[in-house]
Design a protein with these regions (language model features):
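Conserved beta-sheet core of the metallophosphoesterase superfamily
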Residues: 169-238
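Active-site neighborhood of phospho(di)ester-bond hydrolases with catalytic His/Asp-centered motifs
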Residues: 12-14, 42-48, 72-78, 123, ...
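Active-site environment of divalent metal-dependent phosphoester hydrolases
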Residues: 19-22, 51-56, 78-87, 127-130, ...
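Short acidic, glycine-rich surface-loop motifs adjacent to enzyme active sites
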Residues: 149-166
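Beta-strand-turn-beta hairpins that frame and shape the catalytic cleft
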Residues: 2-11, 109-121, 148-152, 205-210
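A short C-terminal boundary segment appended to hydrolase-like catalytic domains
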Residues: 235-292
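Extended active-site neighborhood of metal-dependent phosphoesterases/phosphodiesterases
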Residues: 59-141, 183-185, 231
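N-terminal active-site segment of His-dependent metallophosphoesterases
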Residues: 1-67, 84, 105, 147-148
Length: 292
């Protein structure tokens, strides 16, 4: 009896902020241990490895990430571009714009309906600014990286392409977000992974699944948002995203159907209490309790 091929498994982390006073080494150890247990095909590290872009912070981040026993694609975030930190990023991690492709073995390709997977990773940061952009001079390069029409296509970026609830003033999308979204949808990209504001959230837009990750290793948390990181599983039917929490819970966050390119399940831990803590719902009357 033939055994089922293994799904494509990815781990997405962001905003570890080495050098931050609230950096939690125990949480980092736990995340690395659990990531190695998952044995992902690839780990996507989508920015803000450091607190202020200093060389010693990058060295610390590199030491931590070297303990993950999987290939990695890493992009810088806005904190990493502070203090000319992008030079230290390049020294420790290589190009700020990169692509990665892995072909599937024949049995796995047949079962997953894809020849392999391609990741295109871009630097959306601007030195010493919190906002960012990609820039139209990069669009042709992005198109040229997605050369395999039957690959699972993944785009990695630090900043948001779509506003995320509960993140404050919506100045966190890149300046050319609309143009970039149009390019990615035209290219048939399946998945966007991003970070930035420490709030995990999931959007489905014109067939594109956008996974925004939280922070797994600091106490810089908004409202009632707990520390978390994301596991993404692509099987023959769907893309499933799971949130991992620091108490070792693993929770299904969203499901996107591959054939119809539509979201089947949305929402996860965001409760009325979370929404109220971020002023997205009115506070309950005295004596009432928010829904959890």
């Amino acid at each position: 009896m033939a055994t089922a091929s293994r799904p494509l498994r990815l781990v997405q982390i962001s905003d570890i902020h080495c050098g931050e006073p609230t950096f939690d080494a125990k949480a980092m150890d736990s995340m690395i241990e659990r990531t190695n247990e998952i044995e992902p095909d690839l780990v996507l590290v989508v920015g803000d490895l450091t607190a202020a872009g200093y060389e010693w912070e990058f060295a610390e981040a590199a030491e931590w990430l070297s303990q993950i026993e999987a290939d990695k694609v890493i992009v810088p975030g806005n904190h990493d571009a502070r203090n000319v930190g992008y030079l230290h990023f390049e020294h420790h991690f290589g190009d700020r714009f990169s692509s990665y492709r892995k072909a599937f073995e024949p049995d796995r390709a047949e079962e997953l309906g894809s020849t392999g997977f391609t990741v295109v990773a871009v630097d959306s940061s601007e030195p010493d600014l919190n906002d960012g952009q990609i820039g139209r001079e990069r669009y042709a390069w992005i198109r040229d990286q997605f050369t395999e029409p039957n690959d699972i296509k993944i785009f990695a970026i630090h900043h948001h392409l779509v506003a995320i609830p509960g993140t404050g003033r919506e100045r966190n999308t890149i300046n050319d977000a609309g143009d970039v979204l149009a390019e990615l949808i035209h290219l048939g990209v399946d998945l966007v992974v991003s970070g930035h504001k420490h709030v995990p959230y999931f959007w489905g837009i014109s067939g594109l699944l956008i996974c925004n990750s939280g922070t797994p290793t600091t106490k810089r948390l908004r409202g009632l948002t707990p520390p978390s990181w994301t596991e993404i599983e692509v099987n023959e039917i769907a893309i499933n995203a799971y949130l991992h929490y620091d108490d070792r819970r693993r929770e299904l966050a969203c499901v996107r159907h591959r054939e119809t390119r539509t979201m089947v399940r949305e929402g996860f831990y965001i409760t009325d209490a979370f929404l109220m803590s971020n002023h997205l719902l009115p506070l309950p009357s005295r004596g009432e309790r928010p829904t959890s």
